[in-house]
């Protein structure tokens, strides 16, 4: 404001004073008065994805969209975000519009299902009203809507099976997001919308894939993640998991178009150890010569699966490698106490 004319400055101050009198203190302010605000984030539980997102996780007070084909890992990633928020003492809610949430699987991923607020709404309007009420409470840290495609407008549910309802869902989403955006930002809640894929008919050139629910979510979302299964993980004759790639197609809080790759193991979720090995090799913290993986003088094992198993059995080594990677990317360091408690929880849930 140094170069602005004194009369203009005085006029701005007077206008700001009138606005504060009318709408309350804090309704208008100069951005520099508060200093540079630090963008708070909730970890995704996946080191490579936290790095790709640029701020160490999904930003608080923003709308996130996760979309991809069936069985690609959308719900798994969302549940990991819920688990990470709960570990830090946060509250979480899950709007299960698909009526397909598996509490046993959620528990295995580290979600505290006893404290998880769950709703299985009958209509899209009901789902979004519940979402608004929970966000407005200011007590929820992470809220997941699974999924946008399952938010069926009331008129469609009450109508006949063959009736045409063009644009109803898009109008519903557009209206809801207009109402929700400000509330989400004030409450500092992460709202994750899971979405499916559809194909446009008659597209000859370009990408025929699109997401249901109209265009509003594309605009209002601060982060959009495209998640795909790229390979199967085999052990012997059986398939034990999926290799997954996430592309950050939109990011308002950091540079976009970054990618992350990780393992999603069946009944376990995202493999933390596999992620540490992969990122460690990429950053030259873990050395790979032939099939052998080593960290300094410590031999982790021959083959990636053996290296993963070694880190699982030696959490202190895994923590040391992880914190070196986190330091390199200026991410908050992981704590030993938390990591061991997570190990115990995982072991207990697998035994049960």
Curated annotation (Swiss-Prot):
Q: Give Gene Ontology CC terms.
A: cytosol
- Whether Cell inner membrane counts among this entry's keywords is no
Name the Gene Ontology molecular function terms of this record.
ATP binding; ATP hydrolysis activity; ATP-dependent DNA damage sensor activity; damaged DNA binding; single-stranded DNA binding
Q: Which GO terms describe its biological process?
A: DNA recombination; DNA repair; SOS response
> By which gene is this protein encoded?
recA
Alphabetized CDD domains for the sequence: RecA (cd00983)
InterPro entries in the record: AAA+_ATPase (IPR003593), DNA_recomb/repair_RecA (IPR013765), DNA_recomb/repair_RecA_CS (IPR020584), P-loop_NTPase (IPR027417), RecA-like_C (IPR049261), RecA-like_N (IPR049428), RecA_ATP-bd (IPR020588), RecA_C_sf (IPR023400)
The answer to whether keyword Disulfide bond applies is no
The residues listed in the UniProt record as binding ATP, with positions renumbered to this chain, are 68-75
User: What does the UniProt keyword field contain?
Assistant: ATP-binding, Cytoplasm, DNA damage, DNA recombination, DNA repair, DNA-binding, Nucleotide-binding, SOS response
The organism encoding this protein is: Clostridium perfringens (strain SM101 / Type A)
Q: Name one Pfam family in it.
A: RecA_C
Q: Where in the cell is it found?
A: Cytoplasm
PANTHER family listed in its UniProt record: MITOCHONDRIAL DNA REPAIR PROTEIN RECA HOMOLOG-RELATED, RECA
Q: What does this protein do?
A: Can catalyze the hydrolysis of ATP in the presence of single-stranded DNA, the ATP-dependent uptake of single-stranded DNA by duplex DNA, and the ATP-dependent hybridization of homologous single-stranded DNAs. It interacts with LexA causing its activation and leading to its autocatalytic cleavage.
Which protein are we looking at?
Protein RecA
Say where the protein is mainly found: cytoplasm
PROSITE patterns listed in its UniProt record: RECA_1 (PS00321), RECA_2 (PS50162), RECA_3 (PS50163)
Say which family it is in. Answer: Belongs to the RecA family.
């Amino acid at each position: 404001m140094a170069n602005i004319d004194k009369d203009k400055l005085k006029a701005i101050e007077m206008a700001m004073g009138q606005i504060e009198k009318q709408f309350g203190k804090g309704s208008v302010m100069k951005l520099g008065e508060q200093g540079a605000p630090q963008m708070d984030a909730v970890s995704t539980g996946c080191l490579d994805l936290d790095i790709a997102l640029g701020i160490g996780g999904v930003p608080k007070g923003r709308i996130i969209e996760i979309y991809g084909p069936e069985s690609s890992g959308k719900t798994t990633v969302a549940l990991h975000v819920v688990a990470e928020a709960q570990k830090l003492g946060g509250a979480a809610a899950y709007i299960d519009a698909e009526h397909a949430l598996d509490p046993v699987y959620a528990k295995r991923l580290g979600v505290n299902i006893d404290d998880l607020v769950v709703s299985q709404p009958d209509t899209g309007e009901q789902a979004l009203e519940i979402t608004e009420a929970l966000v407005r409470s200011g007590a929820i840290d992470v809220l997941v809507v699974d999924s946008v495609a399952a938010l069926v407008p009331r008129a469609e549910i009450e109508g006949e099976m063959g009736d045409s309802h063009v644009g109803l869902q898009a109008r519903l989403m557009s209206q809801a997001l207009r109402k929700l955006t400000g509330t989400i930002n004030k409450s500092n809640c992460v709202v994750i919308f899971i979405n499916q894929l559809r194909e446009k008919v008659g597209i000859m050139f370009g990408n025929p894939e699109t997401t249901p629910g109209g265009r509003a979510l594309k605009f209002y979302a601060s982060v959009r993640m495209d998640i795909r299964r790229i390979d199967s993980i085999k052990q012997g004759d059986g398939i034990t998991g999926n290799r997954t790639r996430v592309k950050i197609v939109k990011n308002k809080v950091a540079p976009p178009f970054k990618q992350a790759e990780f393992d999603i193991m069946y009944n376990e979720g995202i493999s933390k150890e596999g992620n540490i090995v992969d990122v460690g090799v990429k950053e030259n913290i873990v050395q790979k010569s032939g099939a052998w993986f080593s960290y300094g003088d410590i031999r982790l094992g021959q083959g990636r699966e053996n290296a993963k198993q070694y880190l699982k059995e030696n959490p202190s080594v895994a923590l040391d490698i992880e914190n070196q990677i986190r330091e390199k990317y200026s991410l908050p360091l992981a704590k030993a106490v938390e990591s061991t408690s997570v190990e115990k929880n995982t072991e207990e849930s697998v035994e049960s």
